[in-house]
Regions:
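Flexible interdomain linker/hinge and immediately adjacent N-terminus
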Residues: 10-41, 91, 116
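N-terminal DNA-binding recognition helix of tyrosine site-specific recombinases/integrases
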Residues: 1-19, 63-66
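Major-groove DNA-contacting interfaces characterized by cationic-aromatic clusters
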Residues: 16, 89-91, 104-136
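Conserved tyrosine-mediated DNA breakage-rejoining catalytic core shared by Y-recombinases
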Residues: 70-109
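Catalytic-site neighborhood detector that most strongly recognizes the C-terminal catalytic loop/helix
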Residues: 33, 94, 172, 177-197
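C-terminal secondary-structure termini that scaffold catalytic or DNA-interacting sites
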Residues: 199-206
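Short, basic (Lys/Arg/His-rich) helix/loop patches that form interaction surfaces
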Residues: 116-121, 131-170, 174
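Basic, Lys/Arg- and aromatic-enriched nucleic-acid-binding interface segment
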Residues: 25-28, 36-65
C-alpha cells in the first residue's frame, strides 16, 4: 500500500500520506512441517543421489537451502566431532554465523557423493534444480513440502522432543525466540490435556 501511495504522489496525485496509515501486524502462522510418517516416505523415495544429500543435510541440521549449497568439502573435513556430531559453522540469514551439527553417517555419505565431482562445495546442483526436483517429488508422493519445510521439520522435531526453546533458537539462527515459537505446534488433544491439568488441580482443592 505504501508503494502504491508513493507512486500516486510521484504522478502528481495528492493522496493521503502513507505515514498516516497504520498497518496492523499480522501474526505469523505456524510453520508447515512433515510428519514422521511423511519423512519415512520421503526417504524411501527413489531419487538422484545429489538431491538425497541435499535433503538429508537440510532435514538433519535445519540448514537453509542456501546454507546447504554453500557447504564445502573442506568445512566438512575440518569439522570438529562433538557428542558424535560434526560441528560446522555456516553463514546464515543476514550474514549471521552459527553452528550446525551433522550426523556422522550423513557426513560420510555427503563426502562419498562429493568425491564424484570437482567443485569445492559438497553439492554440485544449482538452486533451481533442487527446487525443480522437490516439486516433482511432492507431486509423486502426494503431499506438499519445500526445501524450507525440511528446516521447519527439523526444528519442530526438536521442540516436540522437549528441547529448550532458547537452544533451538540458537540452532535455528533466529533473531528472537518469538520466531522459534512458531514450532510449538499443538493438537487439540494436546491442548485439552494441558487444560485438564489445571482443572484437576482445582478439583483436588475442593
Amino acid at each position: 500500500m505504501k508503494a502504491f501511495l508513493n507512486f500516486c504522489y510521484n504522478r502528481g496525485y495528492h493522496t493521503l500520506s502513507w505515514s498516516a496509515i497504520f498497518l496492523p501486524k499480522v501474526p505469523k502462522s505456524e510453520a508447515h512441517y512433515l510428519t514422521e510418517k511423511q519423512v519415512h516416505t520421503l526417504l524411501e523415495y527413489d531419487m538422484d543421489e545429489g538431491i538425497r544429500v541435499s535433503i538429508l543435510l537440510m532435514l538433519s541440521t535445519g540448514m537453509r537451502i542456501s546454507e546447504a549449497l554453500s557447504l564445502t568439502k573442506n568445512q566438512i573435513k575440518k569439522a570438529e566431532l562433538v557428542e558424535g556430531l560434526y560441528q560446522v559453522s555456516v553463514l546464515g540469514k543476514c550474514r549471521k554465523l552459527r553452528s550446525v551439527f551433522i550426523p556422522q553417517d550423513i557426513v560420510a555419505y555427503s563426502l562419498q557423493y562429493a568425491c564424484n565431482h570437482t567443485k569445492d562445495q559438497i553439492l554440485d546442483i544449482p538452486y533451481w534444480k533442487i527446487q525443480q526436483k522437490l516439486k516433482k517429488i511432492t507431486k509423486d508422493l502426494g503431499f506438499y513440502f519445500s526445501a524450507h519445510t525440511l528446516r521447519h521439520t527439523y526444528l519442530t522435531f526438536l521442540v516436540k522432543n522437549k528441547w529448550d526453546l532458547y537452544k533451538v533458537q540458537r540452532l535455528a539462527g533466529h533473531s528472537t525466540v518469538a520466531i522459534t515459537s512458531r514450532y510449538l505446534h499443538a493438537t487439540d488433544y494436546e491442548l485439552a490435556e494441558t487444560a485438564k491439568l489445571v482443572n484437576n488441580l482445582l478439583q483436588s482443592t475442593d
